[in-house]
């Protein structure tokens, strides 16, 4: 597929380029350019980014970094079955667990909340870094809601990290918790937590302030 001439592949981080060294020089350049295009288009044209992900994986299917990039591109484009396939492959190759929350969310997207919960309860989850651990909580709570288990969703999100105000995931966690409370019919508590969420949301990425006043 067509790639702009100005995209050279040199734009990739050195650590990613280093993982392409096992490829021939010509193939490495092709793959690198496709990976750059994923980054270029992932926000503005996720379907095009996904196509570049497919192309990159076609040229370098044995490299975890390539399969993972293709998986994330497919996920952002809403192609959950493909995303799950690519992320599973990357996980098998590298053993890296950081993509487990996205894999669980893919299962939700495919209408498999029980599979999402099974993944959320797997022993490997204990190896997640804190941001991914929080993301897995949010995904698991969503799976509970998919099953109609609204109180269980609240319980899933109840954790000491709700008091955190500085980490990048704090806003998402508080919002998910407030939304779960609201869905469970606990309106007063939900408003309180939407207000706490709004305190962190200075740039108004969410509608927390509005929902706190409902």
Regions found by a protein language model. Give the residues of each.
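TPR/TPR-like (Sel1-like) alpha-helical repeat modules
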Residues: 93-96, 125-126, 155-161, 182-206, ...
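Short, small-residue-biased leader/transition segments that mark boundaries at the very start
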Residues: 1-3
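Structural motif corresponding to the intra-repeat A-B loop/turn of tetratricopeptide repeats
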Residues: 42-44, 77, 110, 147, ...
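Structural register within alpha-helical repeat arrays
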Residues: 37, 69-70, 103, 140, ...
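Generic helix N-cap/helix-start motif at coil->alpha-helix transitions
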Residues: 26-34, 49, 60-67, 94-102, ...
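Alpha-helical segment of the N-proximal tetratricopeptide repeat
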Residues: 11, 22-58, 69, 75
């Amino acid at each position: 597929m067509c790639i702009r001439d100005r995209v050279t592949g040199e734009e990739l981080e050195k650590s990613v380029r280093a993982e392409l060294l096992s490829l021939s020089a010509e193939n490495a350049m092709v793959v690198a350019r496709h990976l750059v295009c994923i980054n270029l288009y992932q926000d503005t044209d996720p379907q095009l980014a996904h196509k570049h992900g497919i192309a990159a994986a076609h040229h370098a299917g044995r490299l975890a970094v390539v399969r993972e990039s293709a998986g994330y591109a497919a996920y952002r484009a809403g192609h959950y079955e493909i995303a799950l396939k690519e992320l599973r492959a990357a996980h098998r190759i590298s053993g890296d667990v950081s993509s487990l929350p996205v894999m669980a969310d893919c299962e939700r997207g495919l209408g498999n909340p029980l599979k999402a919960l099974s993944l959320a309860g797997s022993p490997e989850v204990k190896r997640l870094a804190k941001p991914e651990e929080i993301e897995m909580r949010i995904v698991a709570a969503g799976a509970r809601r998919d099953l109609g288990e609204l109180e269980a969703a609240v319980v899933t999100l109840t954790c000491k990290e709700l008091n955190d105000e500085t980490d990048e995931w704090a806003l998402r966690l508080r919002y998910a918790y407030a939304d779960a409370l609201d869905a469970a019919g606990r309106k007063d508590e939900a408003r309180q937590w939407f207000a706490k969420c709004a305190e962190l949301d200075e740039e108004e990425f969410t509608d927390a302030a509005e929902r706190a006043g409902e």
